[in-house]
Curated annotation (Swiss-Prot):
GO terms for molecular function: calcium channel regulator activity; toxin activity. It is found in: Secreted. Belongs to the venom Ptu1-like knottin family. The lineage of its organism: Eukaryota, Metazoa, Ecdysozoa, Arthropoda, Hexapoda. It comes from Platymeris rhadamanthus. GO terms for cellular component: extracellular region. Binds reversibly and blocks P/Q-type voltage-gated calcium channels (Cav). This is U-reduvitoxin-Pr6a. Keywords: Calcium channel impairing toxin, Disulfide bond, Ion channel impairing toxin, Knottin, Neurotoxin, Secreted, Signal, Toxin, Voltage-gated calcium channel impairing toxin. The keyword Transferase does not apply. Its main location: secreted.
Amino acid sequence: MKVFLLTILLCFLIAYCAGTNIFDPDNNPMCIPQGEKCVMRDFGCCLPYQCDWMKNRCK
């Protein structure tokens, strides 16, 4: 049963990532604008900004 639930969760994660299209920031409505709060260094911020991990803001 655990394997089944894990498989379903994995499918949802893959669909979510494919749906937001993290590799094409121009088509990504989920990207974070400059100055907004971010969590991970490489994901989330609109290009050309990156997440400043010291301040947790896109810059």
